[in-house]
Amino acid sequence: MSNSVKGEIVKIAGPVVEAVGCEGAKMYEVFRVGDEGLIGEVINIESDRATIQVYEETTGLQPGEPVKGTGELLSVELGPGLLTQIFDGIQRPLPEIRKEVGDFVERGILVSALDRKKKWEFTPKVKEGEKVEEGDVLGTVPETEFIEHKIMVPPGVSGEVIEIAADGEYTVEDTIAVIEDEEGEEHEVTMMQEWPVRKPRPYKRKLDPEEPLITGQRVIDTFFPVAKGGTAAIPGPFGSGKTVTQQQLAKWADAQVVVYIGCGERGNEMTEVLEDFPELEDPRTGRPLMERTILVANTSNMPVAAREACIYTGITMAEYYRDMGYDVALMADSTSRWAEALREISGRLEEMPGEEGYPAYLASRLAEFYERAGRVVCLGSDDRVGSVTVVGAVSPPGGDFSEPVTQNTLRIVKVFWALDSKLADRRHFPAINWLQSYSLYLDDVEKWWHEEIGGDWRELRDEAMEILQRESELEEIVQLVGPDALPESERLILEVARMIREDFLQQNAFHEVDTYCPPEKQYEMLKTILHFKERAEEAVDKGVPVDEILKLDVIDDIARMKVIPNEEAKEKIQEIRKKIDEQFEELIEEAS
């Protein structure tokens, strides 16, 4: 560790400390601050004066205490052992800290992110004498039962393998390969890499997002899909279901790895994730969900400055698994708290405030974060494809979508799931407002739906959206004159719209079947509701009153479609469609 830069504190303003005598300090270098050695990062340099953002509580620091440079940028450790772990905002493992110091995190404590003693079973994939380039897989480690951790050549290293470890157990610090580059320099490679959090990890090229990220939530997958490698935002007022929606996505999204960042939200929400995930089963592998999850917990009672770092810590770990060729989903709950941390630090630095006190660079910082999402061809000669999908929750004060964080986020992301407190008050969950939300990935994922699920998926989805829009137009008339004054065809539209809302869009996150709805079942359900509409319109044209149609008992069967077990769904829903045909034929016969 290079301790070349040493200075002393002259000013303390909350989490921001100024020190003099820091010639030679680098931007974003990690410093140990004060006698307790608090962790901080240089965010501004003027001649020998460095401004340091401290990631721990600064109470009790005094001017005159020393600061020391470590010579390293704020980095994360990447290697086997990240999955199932829970870190704080600067990648210190909380369970390990608890073992060392008890329930409360002591200031200045340093614990390695990866366990240095644990041995991992390594299987080599290259031989001595082989040529490798950056990103090539040197060997694999079974990190969990279903995630094979690929040990890759670090970015910036290529050449000939002159040594490779045999099959066996090694720690993350043991050398598992030696690579000689063209200049004849030897590079020792361990299972662990370090990477600066503010620097995106490199890749060969970006690809178009074409495949949807299946979440099992009907309103998302069918109406407002997000693609693998896409970006989405969930803004909503308090109590509208942001965190439950985020947790549902973390539980059921068909990504192989999930990074869940609790950024400035309540501690008990992270506790809920910690309690639920080990018990919940991944529908694709049958293993506990925790085995594919990394948690970054930086709750509201932790120091503000570390909130700013936790988003970068999370996305760097997500990019590392993307580089192995995995699909990764990253949930950030909530980016508003992150923006508030930026605002506080900007205020302490006495910078010129922008709109609502946020710094003028808020938009570019948000864009830097969301731009690290994407579906890419990874480094390496085998052209692996990996993706990072980013879903950010936004908590606008009072549910006001015109505030700066929401507006800047909407300029960047392609999917907008607008949570509506009116729907939440009516107990309609997920409370995603179908009239305000949108997805710009519809055209990209259409091909996948048509090839994998059903050729008329887009037509069904667009027809259902039209019905819901028509309902909102009719609602004003209904409030004035009541539904009985409407013509029969429009009363029918209201009934079908009610079916779409209650029997399709509403979904119970706490019901064992309804919590996850596979795309095949979503398609069959929507097709059945629209088939009912088609037959009902035919009946109305032949003189059958809508009141008679509403007495059909098949309407109850349609309402119960969502709780049909997923493996039996296709058959049973097709039977309901037959029943619709039979009951309408009887009705039309009676009317004629």
Curated annotation (Swiss-Prot):
InterPro entries: AAA+_ATPase, ATP-synt_VA_C, ATP-synth_a_Xtn, ATP_synth_asu-like_sf, ATP_synth_asu_arc, ATPase_a/bsu_AS, ATPase_F1/V1/A1_a/bsu_N, ATPase_F1/V1/A1_a/bsu_N_sf. The keyword Nucleotide-binding applies. It is found in: Cell membrane. SUPFAM superfamilies: C-terminal domain of alpha and beta subunits of F1 ATP synthase (SSF47917), N-terminal domain of alpha and beta subunits of F1 ATP synthase (SSF50615), P-loop containing nucleoside triphosphate hydrolases (SSF52540). ATP binds at residues 236-243. Its EC number is 7.1.2.2. One of its GO terms (biological process) is proton motive force-driven plasma membrane ATP synthesis. Its main location: membrane. It catalyses: ATP + H2O + 4 H(+)(in) = ADP + phosphate + 5 H(+)(out). One of its GO terms (cellular component) is plasma membrane. Coiled coil: none annotated. It is a peripheral membrane protein. GO terms for molecular function: ATP binding; ATP hydrolysis activity; proton-transporting ATP synthase activity, rotational mechanism; proton-transporting ATPase activity, rotational mechanism. Keywords: ATP synthesis, ATP-binding, Cell membrane, Hydrogen ion transport, Ion transport, Membrane, Nucleotide-binding, Translocase, Transport. Pfam families: ATP-synt_ab, ATP-synt_ab_N, ATP-synt_ab_Xtn, ATP-synt_VA_C. The keyword ATP-binding applies. Component of the A-type ATP synthase that produces ATP from ADP in the presence of a proton gradient across the membrane. The A chain is the catalytic subunit. Belongs to the ATPase alpha/beta chains family. Has multiple subunits with at least A(3), B(3), C, D, E, F, H, I and proteolipid K(x). This is A-type ATP synthase subunit A. The gene is atpA.
